């Protein structure tokens, strides 16, 4: 490790220990870092840190060394001293150092090329050369973009020697101590010193770091550090207690800028064989916010033991790892003409374990380009090979870095972390975390190892827990794939989420865990490749102990394997589990049209949210599939109650116009000029084969007036109520109608009639199954109609015989009918335009009494609707189409009427029986009238 020094300083000796061998020859064994950190050639060819920006703060880079990376970027920066001297710091400029050598006649200053930075940079990114020794492997991250900045300003060799002599003269007056005192160390310490010279040095390091940060580097290697002052951390803490208050320290400001820029800082621990590292590696102890961005580097030898010279991790253990420190590095040796001769030399020091770590960060950044700097750091730390005492210890920290393991993903996160995945990826390492992990990004992340997690939040994309996983709490707002995933406390999901089951078992709820289901569900297609009807494809949720679940799914993603074979995957919501089972469609060969439509709907509903939650319907579905017990639900879901009601309404509107014809007939053959009358009708229809009963009640108030012998006007206001009853439904149809009629007699016994009808209706219905309310709703509508009729009158022997033919046009409109309920239907607004042909014949005989008369009569009407044989409607339940049709056809209807009218003075009364014949329905009307 390079020690902070000027030309030389007796209290700050060079820490990078060099064997200073001559340039490596072909016979020499080369010490490469790759085997020790388990970076194989195949792995190195795959991940070389390509494109990752790294920084090195050092000096003596020897940028013309032929083994240097082609991606080396020397930087230039400048600094003005308090005296106004402008210093230029050019990393490409050759730099010299002088070494004092004691002789009999004094101390001689021997100059040499400074090569420390070259050795550091080479470990990171040097090109390989298999012709050197037994094979030089080059840098660990050959593809990295390497930015280098120096802390030594441009000086000629003469200037370097001159400055060294001045330092040597100043040093003669100081006590020559093997171990400097704490006060003397404080005077010369980079962070603690208040000396002017050290202030300038702090500014030099800060200026270089800031220049590197200007280039947006991912990590900065720092193979420099003040001496470790003590093995006792309490002594260290007391020594550096003042730095926390020094807010104007430019070096600390640069360090903080790196943290704010999400740049990692790697610091060599130092080479004093102390139990505590140098202060730069301890900075998170005094500034906890730095821990996520800093790594302390110790060195191990080729036996993977702590190197004899290396400081221990000590108090930096939680952010400390080890790497090889005994390596061959790039060097240049000046010849007699002071021109550099380039090659390799073997050196030792944490100066060289640090760049091995920095380069490894670049390799991991290329591998996990979507991870943050801290997450890359945590990956490197937590995948290290444990050395020394088990776990994170004071000597090795997390252990020896292991790239073979690290490229398979982190084994821990050391803070709450958000993983924003920008490409599909697999992590095969086991992952354990006591912190919250949040998955973001629209791509998939697969955790293939055995995982023990605290809190997982899936916010975006897909997280696949392929390996055996235990987790306390999961919140799923995107896509979570599980395979026997054990939940200890809680699983929650949103309506936009998807749960994907990868294996025979999905979620396992332990202890008192609660599973709250929502969103969609997907069963992996491979689970149904060989399944047959009746096979269980997966257990979606399994409850243990006192665990519970609630909610359900909005969708079960269609399975291609089953769809091709005409099979359906159903979910069975049971007390202690939710299973997915393969079944055939529901069938009933004996079902009628509405029953078949109901079956089609029920099969369609098996793929809707109604089927994907714990409910009576899901219980019925299980019974229907396992025991073939339909319980006539395929009839109950039908909306034929509405179709029957609309068919009845259309028929009723036709009958209203026909009644107006009867009123005109009665008024014309009444001796009074003006009559006012009231009428009440009751009807009961029964169609046993259709399981339909209709009760009809109607009250009318009318007025008739003869304008002349040939013309009669009639107006009728009616209120009617129909009650329909079916085994699984009931409906009430109310209507208020106004009919206005005109009868005019032509010449030669011909007559014509015209009638207009205006009506408003209100409709209510309720559908049920056992004790369950399937749906209930109400709606309103209107009717506009008219009839034109022409007839002929015969009057033989006091009989009145009137055959006639009418044509009706009726528009019936109903607003949309939208139910609420467990299987609610949604039906759009309806409009029917009917054209009816209505032939009719009426017979009446009048017998005169002393003060009145009695008139028996018979009427016969026939309706034939020209457009549409039967009312059909289309509804939907849960987005699935349901076709329903009326069970009683009323498009052709025969109506017979027998009655008697009694006239006494100015009073009239009438009673009649009305018999209507439609297919499978025989209604009887009982009518009473009172005329005045």
Swiss-Prot record:
PROSITE patterns: AUTOTRANSPORTER, SUBTILASE, SUBTILASE_SER. GO terms for cellular component: cell outer membrane; plasma membrane. Keywords: Cell outer membrane, Hydrolase, Membrane, Protease, Serine protease, Signal. This is Serotype-specific antigen 1. The keyword Cell cycle does not apply. Residues 1-24 form the signal peptide. It is an enzyme of class 3 (hydrolase). The active site is at 58 (charge relay system), 116 (charge relay system), 351 (charge relay system). PANTHER family: NEUROENDOCRINE CONVERTASE 1 (PTHR42884:SF14), PROPROTEIN CONVERTASE SUBTILISIN/KEXIN-RELATED (PTHR42884). Its EC number is 3.4.21.-. The gene is ssa1. InterPro entries: Autotransporte_beta (IPR005546), Autotransporte_beta_dom_sf (IPR036709), Peptidase_S8/S53_dom (IPR000209), Peptidase_S8/S53_dom_sf (IPR036852), Peptidase_S8_Ser-AS (IPR023828), Peptidase_S8_subtilisin-rel (IPR015500), Peptidases_S8_Autotransporter (IPR034061). Residues 669-932 form the Autotransporter domain. It comes from the Bacteria. The keyword Transmembrane helix does not apply. Belongs to the peptidase S8 family. One of its GO terms (biological process) is protein processing. Its main location: membrane. Pfam families: Autotransporter, Peptidase_S8. Residues 25-407 form the Peptidase S8 domain. GO terms for molecular function: serine-type endopeptidase activity. It is found in: Cell outer membrane.
């Amino acid at each position: 490790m390079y020690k902070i020094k000027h030309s030389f300083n007796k209290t700050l000796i060079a820490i990078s220990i060099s064997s200073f061998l001559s340039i490596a020859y072909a016979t020499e064994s080369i010490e490469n870092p790759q085997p020790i950190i388990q970076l194989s050639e195949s792995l190195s060819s795959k991940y070389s840190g390509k494109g990752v920006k790294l920084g090195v703060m050092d000096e003596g880079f020897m940028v013309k060394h032929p083994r240097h990376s082609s991606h080396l970027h020397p930087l230039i920066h400048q600094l003005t001293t308090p005296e106004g001297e402008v210093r230029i710091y050019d990393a490409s400029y050759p730099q010299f150092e002088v070494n004092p050598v004691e002789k009999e006649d004094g101390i001689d200053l021997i100059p040499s090329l400074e090569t420390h930075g070259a050795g550091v940079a080479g470990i990171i990114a040097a090109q390989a050369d298999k012709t050197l020794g037994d094979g030089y492997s080059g840098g660990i991250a050959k593809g990295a973009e390497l930015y280098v900045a120096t802390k030594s300003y441009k000086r000629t060799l003469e200037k370097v020697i001159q400055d060294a002599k001045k330092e040597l003269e100043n040093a003669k007056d100081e006590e020559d101590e093997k171990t400097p005192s704490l006060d003397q160390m404080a005077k010369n310490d980079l962070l603690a010193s208040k000396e002017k010279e050290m202030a300038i040095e702090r500014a030099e390091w800060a200026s270089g770091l800031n220049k590197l940060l200007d280039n947006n580097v991912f990590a900065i290697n720092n193979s420099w550090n003040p001496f470790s002052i003590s093995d006792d951390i309490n002594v260290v803490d007391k020594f550096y207690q003042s730095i926390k208050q020094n807010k104007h320290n430019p070096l600390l400001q640069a360090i903080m800028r790196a943290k704010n820029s999400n740049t990692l800082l790697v610091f060599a621990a130092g080479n004093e064989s102390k139990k505590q590292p140098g202060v730069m590696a301890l900075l998170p102890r005094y500034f906890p916010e730095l821990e996520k961005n800093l790594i302390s580097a110790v060195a191990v030898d080729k036996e993977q033991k702590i190197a004899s010279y290396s400081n221990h991790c000590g108090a930096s253990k939680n952010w400390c790892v080890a790497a090889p420190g005994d390596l061959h590095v790039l060097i240049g040796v000046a010849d007699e003409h002071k021109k550099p001769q380039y090659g390799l030399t073997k050196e030792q020091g944490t100066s060289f374990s640090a760049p091995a770590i920095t380069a490894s960060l670049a390799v991991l950044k290329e591998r996990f380009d979507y991870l943050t700097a801290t997450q890359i750091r945590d990956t490197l730390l937590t995948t290290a090979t444990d050395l020394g005492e088990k776990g994170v210890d004071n000597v090795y920290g997390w252990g020896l870095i292991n790239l073979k393991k690290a490229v398979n993903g982190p084994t821990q996160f050391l803070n709450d972390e958000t993983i924003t995945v920008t490409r599909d990826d697999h992590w095969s390492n086991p992952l354990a975390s006591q912190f919250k992990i949040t998955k973001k990004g629209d791509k998939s992340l697969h955790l293939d190892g055995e995982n023990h997690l605290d809190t997982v939040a899936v916010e975006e994309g897909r997280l696949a827990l392929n390996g055996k996983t235990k987790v306390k709490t999961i919140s799923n707002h995107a896509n979570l794939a599980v395979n026997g995933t054990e939940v200890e406390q809680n699983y929650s999901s949103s309506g936009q989420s998807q749960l994907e089951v990868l294996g025979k078992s999905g979620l396992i709820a332990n202890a008192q865990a609660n599973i709250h289901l929502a969103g969609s569900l997907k069963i992996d297609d491979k689970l149904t490749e060989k399944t047959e009807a009746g096979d269980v494809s997966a257990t979606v949720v399994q409850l243990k102990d006192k665990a519970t679940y609630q909610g359900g799914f909005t969708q079960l993603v269609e399975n291609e394997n089953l769809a091709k074979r005409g099979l359906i995957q159903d979910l069975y919501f049971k007390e202690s589990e939710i299973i997915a089972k393969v079944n055939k469609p529901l069938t009933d060969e004996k079902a009628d049209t509405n029953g078949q439509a109901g079956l089609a709907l029920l099969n369609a509903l098996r793929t809707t949210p109604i089927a994907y939650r714990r409910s009576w319907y899901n219980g019925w579905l299980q019974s229907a599939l396992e025991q073939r017990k339909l319980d006539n639900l395929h009839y109950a879901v039908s909306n034929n109650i509405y179709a029957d009601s609309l068919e009845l309404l259309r028929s009723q509107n036709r009958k209203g116009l026909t009644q107006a014809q009867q009123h005109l007939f009665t008024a014309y053959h009444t001796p009074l000029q003006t009559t006012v009358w009231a009428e009440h009708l009751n009807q009961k229809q029964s169609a046993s084969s259709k399981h339909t009963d209709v009760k009809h009640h109607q009250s009318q108030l009318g007025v008739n007036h003869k304008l002349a012998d040939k013309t009669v006007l009639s107006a009728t206001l009616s209120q009617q109520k129909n009650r329909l009853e079916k085994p699984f439904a009931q409906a009430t149809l109310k209507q208020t109608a106004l009919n206005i009629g005109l009868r005019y007699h032509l010449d030669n016994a011909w007559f014509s009639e015209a009638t207009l009808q205006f009506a408003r209706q209100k409709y209510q219905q309720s559908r049920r199954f056992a004790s369950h309310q399937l749906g209930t709703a109400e709606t309103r509508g209107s009717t506009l109609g008219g009839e034109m009729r022409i007839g002929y009158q015969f009057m033989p022997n006091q009989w009145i015989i009137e055959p006639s033919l009418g044509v009706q046009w009726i528009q019936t409109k109903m607003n949309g009918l939208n139910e609420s309920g467990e299987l609610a239907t949604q039906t759009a607004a309806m409009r029917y335009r009917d054209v009816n042909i209505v032939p009719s014949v009426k017979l009446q005989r009048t017998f005169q009494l002393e003060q009145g008369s009695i008139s028996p009569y018979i009427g016969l009407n026939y309706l034939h609707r020209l457009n549409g044989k039967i009312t059909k409607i289309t509804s939907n339940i849960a987005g699935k189409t349901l076709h329903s049709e009326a069970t009683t056809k009323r498009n052709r209807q025969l109506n017979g009427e027998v009655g008697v009218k009694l006239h006494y003075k100015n009073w009239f009364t009438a009673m009649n029986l009305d018999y209507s014949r439609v297919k499978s329905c025989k209604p009887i009307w009982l009518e009473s009238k009172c005329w005045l």
